[in-house]
Amino acid sequence: MIEVLLVTICLAVFPYPGSSIILESGNVDDYEVVYPQKLTALPKGAVQPKYEDAMQYEFKVNGEPVVLHLEKNKGLFSEDYSETHYSPDGREITTYPSVEDHCYYHGRIQNDADSTASISACDGLKGYFKLQGETYLIEPLELSDSEAHAVFKYENVEKEDEAPKMCGVTQNWESDESIKKASQLYLTPEQQRFPQRYIELAIVVDHGMYTKYSSNFKKIRKRVHQMVNNINEMYRPLNIAITLSLLDVWSEKDLITMQAVAPTTARLFGDWRETVLLKQKDHDHAQLLTDINFTGNTIGWAYMGGMCNAKNSVGIVKDHSSNVFMVAVTMTHEIGHNLGMEHDDKDKCKCEACIMSAVISDKPSKLFSDCSKDYYQTFLTNSKPQCIINAPLRTDTVSTPVSGNEFLEAGEECDCGSPSNPCCDAATCKLRPGAQCADGLCCDQCRFKKKRTICRRARGDNPDDRCTGQSADCPRNS
């Protein structure tokens, strides 16, 4: 039997329309101050770990209460995850820190089928969530009241400079005829069910970035972990699991000659990866995080279709923003090039601001366009990259079912947690006899609402969202 433990903090919200604040993510216009309320479901008699496998938080956004359901990203680190830095005399110092009880989560908003979330819960809640089609960021406020957080839209983060930020890859659509043709193909839903693939990622931090963060290894580690958690979430729709295998920080000096021309630095980094890094530890792909200013406002570069090649399975990314999410999007973009994805063409790809846009947009870029999916499918078919087929060593990337965590896991039909729920049997996580559903905007008294019942009122010019009569979810109408 499951007992639900409610840990109530304090729920409040204070909007600050038109005001500005300096946060870790940068200067922010228009934000709300919220005090999240934590709701935790634990088995009776269970010892609460420092960071639970599943958590729930309630707070308000634009005056409306939302419930954020989080589940620990157990596939974030490989089983043999390692960290390397260097002594003053150049010796490698490698450790294998315990990462079992880490603080990085993925999740969703209750009753919003299209929602996603990528959150660090290390010191308060920090990350992003998608709610009703809008991307919001959340992070703790440095106030005497430690529970205060700021919630704000992505586009309300002020630009750190006005110069456009570009990917340095300049190959065009005509550069590969097979890929060009792939962009014109129609993929059936069956074809778009991508096979499960795994990328064991190595991240290398250059000396300039190490110095930028005051030679604070812990601060860099935290930033990188947040970044990879975000990248992992963005690749989930493609059925790609990104696992951090190693973090190598050039704490004493750069181990290659850093150049302002991005492709030159990428070539040197690829040579170093092939001759040095791969001999230290096996991995599938390496990214170099740097503080160098590349020519042409370039913030990233990667080899096209280089995944699994010893020299070319690399990318380089400038740490161009204090906002971790923005740098994570750039790294996601460069990994996409290594997976065969070209830049989105504005005339051929129907996506206003997708991940593979050549220029960073003011609007959130956390989705792959249909063109990108076609490119990736073609890369899998033509190049058959072998290194990303095998799963990492970790065997517990699928969590043990935890009743009451609001995630439908293996073997569960419903997930309520409370024995008093009339629709769901908390002991078995199965629907009770006669019940069609237990939760959702189109579920009422354990039954699906009638077809055409309004489940979400229109916003702007969009039509009302209506139930299908066959599901508890409220689908978004176009």
Curated annotation (Swiss-Prot):
SMART domains: DISIN (SM00050). Residues 468-478 have a biased composition (Polar residues). It is an enzyme of class 3 (hydrolase). Disulfide bonds join 308-387, 349-371, 351-354, 414-429, 416-424, 423-446, 437-443, 442-467, 455-474. Expressed by the venom gland. The record marks 293 as: Not glycosylated. Pfam families: Disintegrin, Pep_M12B_propep, Reprolysin. Residues 197-392 form the Peptidase M12B domain. A motif (Cell attachment site) lies at residues 459-461. GO terms for biological process: proteolysis. Residues 459-478 are annotated as: Disordered. This is Zinc metalloproteinase/disintegrin.
